[in-house]
Amino acid sequence: MTGKEMFEKLGYEKTCHDEREIIYSIYSDNVFIAEIEFDLQNQTFYCAFLDEALEVGMKTLKAINQQCRELGWL
């Protein structure tokens, strides 16, 4: 299963993919809830829940790790 498929299974949708970043976001009733952003230039990622840090569960961590593998970071 790809990182994108794993994120989609968790309810995320890919909202951006360009030369600088990949962003997966979750919305509830069209209201932004959380996002995971991969910075392709700096090979970093961050997780945000509204304006705070996002608690990352093991299924989400597995999706993050899979995406990092696909990007060649791991």
Language model feature labels by segment:
Residues 69-74:
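Short acidic DE-rich linear segments
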Residues 1-24:
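Negatively charged, low-complexity tracts enriched in Asp/Glu with abundant Ser/Thr
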Residues 16-61:
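Acidic, low-complexity, intrinsically disordered interaction modules
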